[in-house]
Regions:
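N-terminal beta-strand motif that seeds the catalytic metal site of vicinal oxygen chelate
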Residues: 1-20, 66-69, 126-128
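Amphipathic alpha-helical segments
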Residues: 17-30
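Vicinal oxygen chelate
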Residues: 1-2, 45, 71, 80-128
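Conserved short hydrophobic patches within well-ordered secondary structure
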Residues: 2, 10-13, 29, 55, ...
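Alpha-helical interaction segments
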Residues: 11-14, 61-62, 104-106
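Short, conserved charged micro-motifs
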Residues: 18, 76-80
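Conserved short beta-strand elements that form part of the metal-binding/catalytic scaffold
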Residues: 30-73, 91-92, 116, 122-127
Length: 128
């Protein structure tokens, strides 16, 4: 039933203006016009590939301690370099079976990196 449908990532933030700057300027996502939906004050919808990332205003922003969204990218190391050049700071986690190569966590062929948005939501990159 849902296997052929796109999913939308939904992330809670405190300040939509701050979130918009981060997701557009740092990550390169593009704002989606919601038309006359009346949601523009509370929800920011962003295009990421063929997916959407919706950020919404919430007093619970940043309280999730797990990864909120993951981007599958062909070159994790190159994407990390590009994001660092835009001021994105990467996290370092001690995970079983994983080694570190700079900001990239490595386990066999798996390469992954984690970073946070301004509200502390955990975001990640992983190779296909």
């Amino acid at each position: 039933m849902l296997g052929n449908q796109d999913a939308v990532v939904t992330i809670a933030v405190k300040d939509l203006t701050v979130a918009q700057k981060f997701y557009e300027d740092k990550l390169g996502l593009k704002k989606v016009d919601l038309g006359d939906s009346g949601q523009e004050e509370e929800v920011l919808s962003l295009k990421s590939g063929s997916s959407r990332v919706n950020v919404y205003r919430s007093k619970y922003a940043g309280t999730n301690q797990a990864t909120a969204a993951t981007w599958v990218v062909p070159d994790v190391d190159g994407t990390v370099r590009d994001l660092k050049a835009k001021g994105v700071a990467f996290e370092r986690y001690d995970l079983p079976e994983m080694n570190h190569e700079g900001d990239v966590h490595v386990a066999g062929k798996l390469r992954a990196a984690w970073f946070k948005d301004p509200d502390g939501n955990i975001l990640s990159l992983v190779n296909p």
